[in-house]
């Protein structure tokens, strides 16, 4: 971030930079801090860049939510190749490297309780995460188990919140290992023909 806007970025790249900047603005100042001007300044772009790429503030927030969700799913390897050891293994590092994305997401979750117009976007974002977990668990041998995917995602989401509060990487790592151990036990039960519910 600089004080002077830099040269014009390509259209797709500028939108991504604005989304990433919006995430940082929300992490630092909350949703009330989001304006075309604040986001453009954070991105190092001219004020007009934000209004050019996004018709409204809400559209800019919605696009940033989609961007952050895609980035988090890719970076977290949550839809890994079915290896339970890999499931959420990167969470402690991600929370260290990208705490702003988690802060942004949780800020929007809380705001959606007060602002119903955000709720459908939050639900869609959560569904994307749950679906990625569901696919990963299916590859691991659990079959198509949406209920288990919801519980696993809720656990990862909770570990993320706790990491933001306590800033204790070791505790987050232990939480991930415990989740993986519980999933191994559950998979053993499934392989023996037992039902999880």
PLM regions and their residue ranges:
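Hydrophobic/aromatic-rich alpha-helical bundle segments in the mid-to-C-terminal region
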Residues: 118-119, 123, 138-197
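Amphipathic alpha-helical segments used for helix-helix packing
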Residues: 96-126
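Solvent-exposed, amphipathic alpha-helical segments
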Residues: 17, 21-29, 75, 104, ...
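Short, basic, alpha-helical segments at the C-terminal edge of helix-turn-helix-like DNA-binding modules
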Residues: 66-71
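N-terminal intrinsically disordered/low-complexity leader segments
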Residues: 1-13, 191-197
């Amino acid at each position: 971030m600089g004080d002077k806007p830099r040269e014009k970025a390509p259209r797709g790249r500028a939108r991504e930079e604005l989304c990433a900047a919006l995430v940082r603005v929300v992490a630092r100042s909350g949703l009330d801090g989001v304006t075309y001007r604040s986001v453009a300044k954070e991105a190092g772009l001219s004020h007009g860049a934000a209004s050019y790429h996004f018709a409204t503030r809400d559209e800019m927030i919605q696009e940033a939510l989609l961007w952050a969700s895609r980035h988090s799913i890719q970076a977290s390897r949550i839809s890994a190749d079915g290896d339970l050891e890999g499931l959420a293994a990167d969470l402690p590092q991600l929370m260290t490297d990208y705490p702003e994305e988690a802060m942004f997401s949780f800020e929007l979750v809380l705001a959606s309780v007060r602002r119903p117009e955000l709720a459908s976007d939050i639900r869609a974002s959560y569904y994307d995460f749950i679906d990625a977990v569901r696919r990963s668990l299916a590859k691991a041998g659990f079959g198509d188990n949406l209920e288990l995917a919801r519980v696993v995602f809720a656990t990862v989401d909770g570990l993320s919140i706790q990491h933001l509060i306590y800033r204790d990487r070791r505790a987050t790592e232990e939480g991930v290992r415990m989740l993986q151990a519980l999933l191994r036990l559950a998979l053993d039960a499934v392989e023996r023909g037992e039902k999880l519910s």
